[in-house]
Amino acid sequence: MRECISIHIGQAGIQVGNACWELYCLEHGIQPDGQMPSDKTVGGGDDAFYTFFSETGAGKHVPRAIFVDLEPTVIDEVRTGTYRQLFHPEQLISGKEDAANNFARGHYTIGKEIVDLCLDRIRKLADNCTGLQGFLVFSAVGGGTGSGLGSLLLERLSVDYGKKSKLGFTVYPSPQVSTSVVEPYNSVLSTHSLLEHTDVSVLLDNEAIYDICRRSLDIERPTYTNLNRLVSQVISSLTASLRFDGALNVDVTEFRTNLVPYPRIHFMLSSYAPVISAEKAYHEQLSVAEITNSAFEPSSMMAKCDPRHGKYMACCLMYRGDVVPKDVNAAVATIKTKRTIQFADWCPTGFKCGINYQPPTVVPGGDLAKVQRAVCMISNSTSVAEVFSRIDHKFDLMYAKRAFVHWYVGEGMEEGEFSEAREDLAALEKDYEEVGADSAEGDEEDEGDEY
């Protein structure tokens, strides 16, 4: 078995997690109390969904997940919500006081007290797996818990489970919409550890997803529930090949093999198509070629950056539903001929495709239409550097005046950590710049260095 353990940290991580588990349950026909009427074998069979759920002797299916927050309100919603019976009480870990949007509180003072408990619970989940494949980590880097405790947990996971792959689904601050003043600090400090301790990070950004909801689903004022349901479709498509059988299955470890050319360059853009409301769906023919094209549209990207400004290094297309390899090959061939979609010249093939026969499921009363086929794209593009340069710029403006720094120093950080993290990100921007440069030009310069 190739089990995956999901770790949801902080408010953003937990709320995205709620949307994901709600969707997984619907996809597998698991009721909110964990019973699965269609599953006749008691105890673990070899069905594919055991990658995400474990089964008790009483026939109850329990998610292989853990929810952590430093303050109780968000986790209490899970404890009292529709799916309260789904989770084992020990999987929901909440502290008493908030990280207060402060990376240092999440990482040093308050996070330190709770991290061993989390690792203990993760250890129990891991012992329950026959062949643990890796971790999916959900968090946001703007707040205190997601950034501070999130990076602390990742660092500790690297120590305890060094070889297991870690996929991050990370909510980054948006260009215009801000939820806290110190977002740039938290993001830079947190990215510093994401760089080292995740294998692949998928960037999400609320503003980009708001725009998709507003434009494609005609929701005038999208709520976080709307956003999370869209994000959960992406994550479900990514993990569908682990949970269902298909023609071309994609493994979690395959993402890192196919998408990451150099260890540091592992921040991905994601997009999903078709994002379409029920009213429109009946009037459109959504062929494989069409959904593939719309997945490459800059407006479909779930982070605010324009892939036309950069080059693609690799991309992974996960199709689900009524899709055959012939259509996929034709669609990919068309994409390759487009002028607007440029690939780095050292990566001529650049496509990894997966096909899964399970059509996309929609949440009843949700915004998305039920469609026959969908595609989710995870791409590694040099334009992601825009996200970092935007945050770095805001960081510099504040840090030049040392604004708000005393809150971090007071919780046991040193100013040196700020400059170290900032230098690391400057190096990352430089890395992206170099990877995007044409290799033909690079060859002439290198010849001078050889002795």
Curated annotation (Swiss-Prot):
An individual GO BP term: microtubule cytoskeleton organization
Needed co-factor(s): Mg(2+)
This chain belongs to the protein called Tubulin alpha-1 chain
Which keywords fit this entry according to its UniProt record?
Answer: Acetylation, Cytoplasm, Cytoskeleton, GTP-binding, Hydrolase, Magnesium, Metal-binding, Microtubule, Nucleotide-binding
Source superkingdom: Eukaryota
Processing after translation: Undergoes a tyrosination/detyrosination cycle, the cyclic removal and re-addition of a C-terminal tyrosine residue by the enzymes tubulin tyrosine carboxypeptidase (TTCP) and tubulin tyrosine ligase (TTL), respectively.
Q: What is its main location?
A: cytoplasm
Q: Name one GO cellular component term.
A: cytoplasm
Q: Which parts of this chain are annotated as the region Disordered?
A: 432-451
What is the scientific name of the source organism? Gossypium hirsutum (Upland cotton)
Positions carrying N6-acetyllysine:
K40
Residues at the site labelled Involved in polymerization:
Y451
Q: Which GO terms describe its molecular function?
A: GTP binding; hydrolase activity; metal ion binding; structural constituent of cytoskeleton
Q: What does this protein do?
A: Tubulin is the major constituent of microtubules, a cylinder consisting of laterally associated linear protofilaments composed of alpha- and beta-tubulin heterodimers. Microtubules grow by the addition of GTP-tubulin dimers to the microtubule end, where a stabilizing cap forms. Below the cap, tubulin dimers are in GDP-bound state, owing to GTPase activity of alpha-tubulin.
